[in-house]
A protein has these predicted regions:
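Charged, amphipathic alpha-helical stretches
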Residues: 1-67
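Intrinsically disordered, low-complexity segments enriched in charged and polar residues
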Residues: 130, 136-139, 143-161, 217, ...
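Cysteine-cluster motifs in flexible loop/terminal segments that predominantly coordinate metals
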Residues: 195-236
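N-terminal accessory interaction module
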Residues: 51-149
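A broadly conserved sequence feature marking short terminus-proximal activation segments
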Residues: 143-207, 217
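Surface-exposed polar/charged interaction patches
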Residues: 18-21, 91, 138, 170, ...
Length: 247
């Protein structure tokens, strides 16, 4: 199932425009960067923090989408729109992160389960000097980077590379791109409506599966289901499976 075709079109269009303006720094990840893992219980305390990304007072946007056309992506590309971490020391900044995945074999029976597996990856990234401070279902992500990590050369290519490696451990993921935004709200602005719409699709999937709710008349996601055929196909499949189970 391909819920996000239009979202990919829009994201790739805006990224290309920004590349043409020289606003984006791209690197291709190579395995074996060798950044140490965090020990269990490691924390980045406020006094040790060099950079705070996406503090609630500054705002953040983080989301993940996929396409059934893996070749649309440049595999293992990590893009940074704005300064890298060593240029942000002492700051608390608005932050954006987009994960773009090229996948294989998604259908109405497995799409949501696979999405949950992919979504959980951000909780699995445990790198020394990097700490996820908070996340939410509304596309927010707040993290900290320590002074010692910055001194040792921690960067977005290292963080992005860890994400790339982890996603590619799933056999159904064929290509990955990671995009980070650190230049402020103005450059993130074109992507915010895309994020909002994508998160509505995820919310609709969650309501159908976790709440087992198919009442379109009372559902707050009825408008988005009207726009996305694959959501309607998922709904029909779930209803059919429910009737089979009840029989």
């Amino acid at each position: 199932m391909d819920f996000f075709g239009r979202h990919f079109d829009d994201i790739l269009f805006h990224l290309q425009k920004m590349r043409e303006k020289g606003k984006i720094s791209d690197t291709i990840h190579r395995r074996g960067l060798g950044w140490p893992l965090a020990d269990k219980g490691d924390l980045v305390m406020g006094v040790d923090t060099a950079v705070e990304l996406g503090h609630p007072k500054e705002g953040s946007t983080a989301f993940l989408i996929w396409t059934r056309e893996p070749m649309r992506l440049r595999n293992k590309r990590i893009s940074v729109l704005g300064p890298d971490l060593h240029k942000l020391v002492g700051k608390r900044i608005p932050f954006g992160k987009i994960i773009l995945l090229g996948v294989d074999g998604f259908n109405e029976n497995n799409s949501y389960k696979r999405y949950r597996q992919l979504e959980n990856v951000r909780y699995d990234i445990r790198l020394k000097g990097y700490m996820m401070r908070g996340v939410s279902q509304y596309g927010r992500e707040w993290s900290r980077v320590s002074r010692s990590a910055i001194d040792d050369g921690f960067s977005f290519p290292i963080l992005g590379g860890a994400l790339v490696d982890r996603y590619l451990e799933f056999k159904f993921v064929k290509t990955v791109e990671v995009v980070f935004f650190t230049s402020g709200r103005r450059d993130m602005k074109p992507f915010l409506p895309i994020a909002e719409n994508a998160l509505k699709i995820i919310g609709a999937m969650n309501k159908m599966i976790e709440e087992v709710s198919y009442d379109c008349d009372t559902c707050e996601y009825s408008d988005i289901c009207g726009e996305v055929e694959d959501l309607r196909a998922l709904r029909r499949s779930l209803q059919k499976r429910g009737k089979t189970t009840d029989a």
